[in-house]
Amino acid sequence: MEEATSISLIPPKNRRIGEIIPENTPIQMATVTDSTGYIHPKWFKFQNEERMIVKIDIERVMCQETVKYAGIFEKRIICSIIVNDIRCVAEFRYNIESQRWRIFQVISS
């Protein structure tokens, strides 16, 4: 991916953060994995509607589990993120077979 561009993510008054961050979209995720296999996400990048690369830091991991959807194993990770001083809860999914990350949904904003 390209170098991250620093842009304002403040949504217009009629849009929520969940509408600014694309849901169910592939992302680039930076993580650290400890000796027990627990994944610690640090930040993620995505391409916004203006085709700019946006980087968002992850504040903390709230929960993590392995789930099976229609025969596909995925890591489901719920994290707290901060976008323009607004704390949000986001759900990320990591497909174990394809080894790809996506932001599944922004749960609250």
Model-derived segments and spans:
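Cysteine-centric segments in proteins
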Residues: M1-S109
